[in-house]
Amino acid sequence: MNTHNIFKSVLFSTLLLIGNSCSDRKGIDVIPMPRSVEYHSGNFTISPETKFYTNLSAESRQALTDYLEGTSLGSVPFAESATGNNGIELNLCDSSIVTGNEAYRIEIDKKGIRLSASTETGIFYGLQTLLQLLNNSDNKTLPALTINDSPRFPYRGLHLDVSRHFFDKEFVKKQLDAMAYFKMNRLHWHLTDGAGWRIEIKKYPRLTSFAAWRPFDKLNDWWVGGRTFCEQDDPRAVGGYYTQDDIREVVAYAAERHITIIPEIEMPGHSEEVLATYPELSCSGKPYVNADFCIGTEKTFEFLENVLLEVIDLFPSEYI
């Protein structure tokens, strides 16, 4: 067999495998693809008469109502008891039925939808799958099917660097919404680096009144223009930071979406912004000379400990 024929054989085999894979997953467009999807005959259409039924607590039910507002499920009200027809049941079940803290099962037939999970996290992720199914459906009509799903990886994260390019808290919330939609559960928040300090530390107010502001609109201009900082009220000032109240708000917003925020405080290197502000923490004792903390002075360790104490108080994450 010549090279041309070998290539055609390999190409044909590859296309055949892809085709078989796609045919097994017809009619569903969900990211990430659930572990198991079984298709049945028929379908179910969400109508103005469709209602949610659930055994979740009143507090959890209200939290879901608030979360779903503005989504394709936002118009579906919660009812007090199930009728068995034309409903979306959210069933918090025993772990012997659905195993895994983030696992869920969805069953759709002509009578309605049943979403089961042994944790509220599982219920939340099942709702993300329903939202994706609805957003890719015609007239809110879903195929009859059974989905059994759980994550392959326990850590599903996104890294967001707000030092080099600052994004306000509303942007961060939008990122969290997108992460939740795709069942991601960790935000690695890069809050400090040589290009800017972005978190309020009450013991060191100059970190946000000076080290959070650059006299250049573009990062590259700052990079080649001396890498200096300026006062917050300088007309050239570009940057920003999060107050501690902002941090608490974003952390709570993430928790409602079952996302843990892991803050990063850069040390001992990439610390030009700190050493420009507090040059006594550098080995030269001068601003704009060093990028690394001086480990030969006790002042450095006192500074880092004080910073981390405030950071730890703001973030419930296991890791900092």
List PLM regions with ranges.
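Contiguous, structured surface segment used for ligand recognition
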Residues: 22-155
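Alpha-helical structural motif
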Residues: 9-10, 60, 126, 300
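Feature activates predominantly on carbohydrate-active enzymes
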Residues: 97-303, 307-320
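Generic detector of low-complexity/intrinsically disordered segments
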Residues: 9, 13, 17-19, 66, ...
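Bacterial Sec-dependent N-terminal signal peptides
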Residues: 1-29
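Low-complexity, compositionally biased segments
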Residues: 5-8, 23, 69, 164, ...
